[in-house]
């Protein structure tokens, strides 16, 4: 893999060699100006990757195109072999960097948001009871006492209020790529973590929880920040040992992003189950990321009467439904809150994945298929081309 190591060599010579592509965004409103994610070819070695980043830094400095304070290459990541980095370039420099044959593609960095969309008060939660029964209307949650013990849950979100009583001392901070405030200033991350693994509100009541903060107090972040969070979690899981059991929940989404999808795919390949919210735009989930990644478990939201929630995204990329309307779970400050959205549906599935890993020893790579196998065909009037499968923990199977 050749790199341009002598700056005096014309950049034009690279154009005749197979090189990367500068991708464009379908929704320019989501694009962060002058911000990019650079992804390298699969066969680029670590040494070549380092050399490329040094070269890119020099190209950025030499071309002096920094009209808006662009700073050049930034943080780099390596997720189970997927190498890349964030960068602040003007468009002309980005095109020049894309001409390096070591580059697979460059895409604009974009805004990503938490996917909860409705807040309701004084509504009892019903999701736990529904996932342990084959019919509606039950009021008890039945589960095996293993309850996700020995499994690590990564909440890639707005953070977790680790002092909340619903976590019973099982939650800790992992990383924060947003700011220096290791708190959940939004509440979304605490709620989703509680749904997955809270002692009172959660599915896998004995799992360990790790906060991976990639969204700020306003519920928004960047694709590059999300990728950094995934990168950290993969490395943390690796440090814990190859025989560990790991699940990740990402109740967030944005415009379609090849970089985010590729990163999510490599999270799964590394041995971490990944549950993802389908999104709340009432449109085909293939338009958003990471929901459209083939390797993840993409979750739509159901109602208490087994309907498809009016807001949920849909389509062939959806693996199954889970309770997502009027879900009560822990909230920062010691209390609880009732929220609706595919954000609430996805952690139910992450919790069941942790539950099955502890109970059956199912692997991360097979967990989504096992969950779909156990699911009941209960959703009435699912949108055309969308599964009718509804999450079920298999307690009476």
UniProtKB/Swiss-Prot annotation:
The active site is at 157 (charge relay system), 188 (charge relay system), 343 (charge relay system). It comes from Penicillium citrinum. Protease activity is retained up to 40 degrees Celsius for 30 minutes, but completely inactivated at 50 degrees Celsius (at pH 7). Activity is retained up to 25 degrees Celsius, and completely inactivated at 40 degrees Celsius (at pH 11). SUPFAM superfamilies: Protease propeptides/inhibitors, Subtilisin-like. CDD domains: Peptidases_S8_PCSK9_ProteinaseK_like. GO terms for biological process: proteolysis. Residues 35-113 form the Inhibitor I9 domain. Residues 125-397 form the Peptidase S8 domain. InterPro entries: PCSK9_ProteinaseK-like (IPR034193), Peptidase_S8/S53_dom (IPR000209), Peptidase_S8/S53_dom_sf (IPR036852), Peptidase_S8_Ser-AS (IPR023828), Peptidase_S8_subtilisin-like (IPR050131), Peptidase_S8_subtilisin-rel (IPR015500), S8pro/Inhibitor_I9 (IPR010259), S8pro/Inhibitor_I9_sf (IPR037045). Its EC number is 3.4.21.-. The record marks 280 as: Important for catalytic activity. Active at pH 7 (up to 40 degrees Celsius for 30 minutes) and at pH 11 (up to 25 degrees Celsius). Belongs to the peptidase S8 family. This is Subtilisin-like serine protease Pen c 1. Residues 1-19 form the signal peptide. Pfam families: Inhibitor_I9, Peptidase_S8. Its main location: secreted. GO terms for molecular function: serine-type endopeptidase activity. Keywords: Allergen, Hydrolase, Protease, Secreted, Serine protease, Signal, Zymogen. Residues 20-115 form a propeptide. The record marks 113, 249, 284 as: Not glycosylated. Serine protease. Hydrolyzes azocasein. Cleaves peptide bonds of the oxidized insulin B chain preferably at 15-Leu-|-Tyr-16, but also at 4-Gln-|-His-5 and 24-Phe-|-Phe-25, and to a lesser extent at 5-His-|-Leu-6 and 25-Phe-|-Tyr-26. Hydrolyzes amide bonds between amino acids and 7-amino-4-methylcoumarin (AMC) in vitro. It is found in: Secreted. Inhibited by 0.1 mM diisopropyl fluorophosphate (DFP), phenylmethanesulfonyl fluoride (PMSF), chymostatin and elastatinal. Not inhibited by N-alpha-p-tosyl-L-lysine chloromethylketone (TLCK), N-tosyl-L-phenylalanyl chloromethyl ketone (TPCK) or N-carbobenzoxy-L-phenylalanine chloromethylketone (ZPCK). One of its GO terms (cellular component) is extracellular space.
């Amino acid at each position: 893999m050749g790199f341009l190591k002598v700056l005096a060599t014309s950049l034009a010579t690279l154009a005749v060699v197979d090189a990367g592509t500068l991708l464009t965004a379908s929704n320019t409103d989501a694009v962060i100006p002058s911000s990019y994610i650079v992804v390298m070819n699969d066969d680029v070695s670590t040494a070549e990757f380092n050399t490329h980043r040094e070269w890119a830094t020099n190209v950025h400095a030499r071309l002096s195109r920094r009209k808006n304070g662009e700073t050049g290459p930034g943080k780099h990541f390596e997720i189970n072999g997927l190498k890349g980095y964030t960068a602040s370039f003007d468009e002309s420099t980005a095109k020049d960097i894309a001409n390096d044959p070591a580059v697979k593609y460059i895409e604009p960095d974009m805004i990503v948001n938490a996917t909860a969309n409705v807040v309701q008060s004084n509504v009892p939660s019903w999701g736990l009871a529904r996932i342990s029964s084959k019919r509606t209307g039950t009021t008890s949650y039945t589960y095996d006492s293993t309850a996700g013990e020995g499994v690590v849950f990564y909440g890639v979100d707005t953070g977790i209020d680790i002092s909340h009583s619903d976590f019973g001392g099982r939650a800790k901070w992992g990383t924060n790529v947003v700011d220096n405030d290791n708190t959940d200033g939004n509440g979304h991350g605490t709620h989703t973590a509680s749904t997955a693994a809270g002692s009172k509100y959660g599915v896998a009541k004995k799992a360990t929880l790790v906060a991976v903060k990639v969204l700020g107090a306003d519920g928004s972040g960047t694709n590059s920040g999300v990728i950094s969070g995934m990168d950290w979690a993969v490395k943390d899981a690796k440090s814990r040992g190859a025989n560990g059991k790991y699940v990740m929940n990402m109740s967030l989404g944005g415009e379609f992003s090849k970089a985010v999808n590729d990163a999510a795919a490599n999270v799964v390949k590394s041995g971490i189950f990944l549950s993802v919210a389908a999104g709340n735009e009432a449109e085909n989930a293939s338009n958003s990321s990471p929901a459209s990644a083939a390797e993840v478990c993409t979750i739509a939201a159901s109602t208490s009467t087994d309907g498809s929630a009016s807001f949920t995204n849909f389509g062939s990329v959806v693996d199954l439904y889970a309770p997502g309307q009027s879900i009560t779970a822990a909230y920062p400050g010691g209390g609880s809150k009732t929220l609706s959205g595919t954000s609430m549906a996805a952690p139910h599935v992450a919790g069941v994945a942790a539950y099955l890993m502890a109970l059956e020893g199912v692997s991360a790579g097979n967990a989504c298929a096992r969950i779909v196998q156990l699911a009941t065909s209960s959703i009435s009037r699912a949108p055309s081309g969308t599964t009718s499968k509804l999450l079920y923990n298999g307690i009476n199977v």
